[in-house]
């Protein structure tokens, strides 16, 4: 890794970065960007502007492939960045090895949000497949968070006594029969549940769940932590060809490295992301509920296998999701 915030020769001209990110990171990167621009200006004298683009992770990846000139991407899952590499050649295939922890500076998991008092008595994944329970989750075709939601439910079903791919598939089919609408991204699903009042339970990123309950409506909503869920690892990457074209490689790389500093890790914890830094994680351990967690590598063999089996055209999701049934 190059030295963090290394001085640049003649780094006085203003620069602009575009961070193309997934749906519920707006608040996180607003604070990260403010901290980084201050640190960078103090170190180099260069003023920078960091612009943000947010949406469903899969949709955002397609926008970059189609020409949105991101200097960096901070998406919901590695498969979306793999697609940018494979389809557009904008960064190397082994991009994930360039930063610590598989290029995931922080993690999250998948939990539930219910209405105050939990009138449907939602306690675990099994409750989401009961008749009469309306579940809000985004579309796995466009949302990275939705894919994590799906895989968390699949892993739970698979790990139950007697669980198999067949029982997990039936479990997911029953779950999606309870989903009345599929938004394109996680923030849209939160709006559907929180503002439009649809659904009994929202499957959500942990950070999005706490944002909704603690900062938007603690008198309206509460978080339910299931017995088991998945370690969600949102990765970050330099988009080499775009950064080189814009002359922003050095500052873009420094920005990504900044995400691993104690300052940025504390900002992540403030916004309910689980810090990867051991010291900051220990300081915020009480802020995050404890539950049994599994990884995508353990259960699905990694993102490439999961994407092909479940979310590519003709995959399991296409077979089980039948609106109107």
Where are these regions (language model features)?
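Short beta-strand->loop
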Residues: 20-22, 114-116, 134-161, 175-179, ...
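Short helix-loop capping/hinge motifs at secondary-structure junctions, enriched
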Residues: 117-123, 142, 155-163, 242-250
